[in-house]
Amino acid sequence: MKADLVVGIQWGDEGKGKIVDSMASAYDVVVRYQGGHNAGHTIVVDGKKIALHLIPSGILYADCKNVIGNGVVVNPEALLKEMKQFEALEGRLFVSDKAHMILPYHEMLDQAREKLMEERAIGTTGKGIGPAYSDKISRNGIRMGELRDIPKLVEKIMEYQEAHAYLSDIYGVKLLGREEITERMSDYAKRLLPFIVDTTKLLWDAMDRGQRILLEGAQGSMLDIDHGTYPFVTSSTTTASGACSGTGLAPKHIGEVVGIAKAYCTRVGNGPFPTEDFGSEGNLLREKGKEFGTTTGRPRRCGWFDAIAVRHACRLNGCENLALMKLDVLDGFPEVKVCVAYLYEGKEIDYIPYDCEGVTPVYKSFAGWDHSEGIREFDALPKSAKEYVLEIEKITGARVSIISTGPDRKDTIRR
């Protein structure tokens, strides 16, 4: 039995939560494998909105095990707050003992750096994700399993803070005292240790028993640390390859990869965004799509569907199937557009160059349509909406097998 994977193939906020939620009932285990509480899913069930930042979307199903893998960076405070939304989590939620911990000074450092960088700021959420991953890579990180030995953990944090006292001088970061560290870590241990396990072994055992596993990515492929619009990227591997290192599953155990994309494009924070619309159409997309960050509330930058970027991401991830989200948001536009090429240094190209900032989109226009909201059969879509979907398939080389026509679970077309 192989594990299936859901991955965002734009700049994040594609609607992965709804798709994972709709798929999760067919799986025994749902796993989050990278990122932190900077990412956010909003799921609508029977009209009720549920926001998830760390806990996998399978938590809404009583018989599903939910795993926060070793590739995730965990803010204990954020996790505990999120856990309060649910009851009886023991035996349903598991946190990797190898997942790294976000501490208060990571958040303070993240926010201070962004402020000092001004125009060169990445536009991070300020949640401490980057500094926590930096500590992990420099081998100075704190892992969740270290909550098993509080005295040793407190000494380690104190030593780290002493070695990095310059952070207080340069960035104004407030370092914690021994008493506060001990109190916080003891509280985290008391409340979280029942959930902290070797999740790699848990997943291996589940696979040996023939259980179905669904891997849930956070953010999007165009924010990948290696393949995204560097340096305006996140600090983890958001592409399918991150699912292996972030869980302990081997590449041969990865099955179907489903790419998630909106029917238009959005981006939060700074960085290249070739199809961004600065005028009334971009504003209307934002208004109709309610494009404001789940985590920060910041307005998202909006623009037309970039088929070149999506095809690039499909190839990075090995996506043969796409889920196209929020098609209904395009209802009522007199004309809709798809970017089918870029102009770069006087030439038309069909790939993403090194300097993505320097491209101009080449669009193909389609007549608009009036009503797709709530439609659940492909043949029932307006003619121009079907043509739009088929053009996306043609350029990206991936089949659009799922189309979302509204926020509820039921507002979904499967082909």
Swiss-Prot record:
Q: Which UniProt keywords apply?
A: Cytoplasm, GTP-binding, Ligase, Magnesium, Metal-binding, Nucleotide-binding, Purine biosynthesis
Name the species this protein comes from.
Wolinella succinogenes (strain ATCC 29543 / DSM 1740 / CCUG 13145 / JCM 31913 / LMG 7466 / NCTC 11488 / FDC 602W)
Requisite cofactors:
Mg(2+)
Catalytic residues as annotated in Swiss-Prot or TrEMBL: D13, H41
Q: In which pathway does it act?
A: Purine metabolism; AMP biosynthesis via de novo pathway; AMP from IMP: step 1/2
Q: Which gene encodes it?
A: purA
Residues that coordinate or bind GTP = 12-18, 40-42, 300, 326-328, 404-406
Q: What is its EC number?
A: 6.3.4.4
Top-level taxonomy: Bacteria, Pseudomonadati, Campylobacterota, Epsilonproteobacteria, Campylobacterales
Q: Where does the chain bind IMP?
A: D13, E14, G15, K16, N38, A39, G40, H41, T125, R139, Q219, T234, R298
Q: What is this protein called?
A: Adenylosuccinate synthetase
GO cellular component annotations, sorted alphabetically?
A: cytoplasm
Positions binding substrate in this chain are: T294, T295, T296, G297, R298, P299, R300
The main enzyme category here is ligase
